[in-house]
């Protein structure tokens, strides 16, 4: 009986690994957009944290350089938070039956 349980666990782990790989591939295709300055600065990135685009409204180019840098950083951080939230949401279905501690993040 122990042998059967072990084989079942191994099969379940292998299936989860395959599902995890598929989910990571899907996350690489999902894009989120972070914004700052009421949308004057936008950063588009995938849920794998690959930046695709940075958009800066032309009206900001003549303004203070420090302010523009702060807005770019804020938009980037907003995009990272959205990517993390989306990733956690998508992964939660895969880990719902596992006894993982609260706040445990996947993929590793």
Swiss-Prot record:
Keyword field contains DNA-binding: yes
One Pfam match: YbaB_DNA_bd
Compositional bias (Pro residues): 99-108
Compartment(s) where it occurs, according to its Swiss-Prot or TrEMBL record: Cytoplasm, Nucleoid
Compositionally skewed regions (Polar residues) per UniProt: 85-95
Coiled coil, from the record: none
Any one GO CC term of the record: bacterial nucleoid
Single GO term (MF): DNA binding
Disulfide bonds: none
Function: Binds to DNA and alters its conformation. May be involved in regulation of gene expression, nucleoid organization and DNA protection.
Subunit and partners: Homodimer.
PANTHER family: NUCLEOID-ASSOCIATED PROTEIN YBAB
Name of the protein in its database record: Nucleoid-associated protein Bcen2424_1826
Source organism phylogeny: Bacteria, Pseudomonadati, Pseudomonadota, Betaproteobacteria, Burkholderiales
């Amino acid at each position: 009986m122990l042998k059967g349980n072990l084989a079942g666990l191994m099969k379940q782990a292998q299936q989860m690994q395959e599902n995890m790989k598929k989910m990571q591939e899907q996350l690489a295709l999902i894009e989120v957009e972070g914004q700052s300055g009421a949308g004057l600065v936008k950063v588009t990135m995938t849920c794998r944290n690959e930046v695709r685009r940075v958009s800066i409204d032309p009206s900001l180019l003549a303004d203070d350089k420090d302010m523009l840098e702060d807005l770019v950083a804020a938009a980037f951080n907003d995009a990272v938070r959205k990517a993390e939230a989306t990733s956690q949401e998508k992964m939660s279905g895969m880990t719902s039956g596992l006894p993982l501690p609260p706040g445990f993040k996947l993929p590793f």
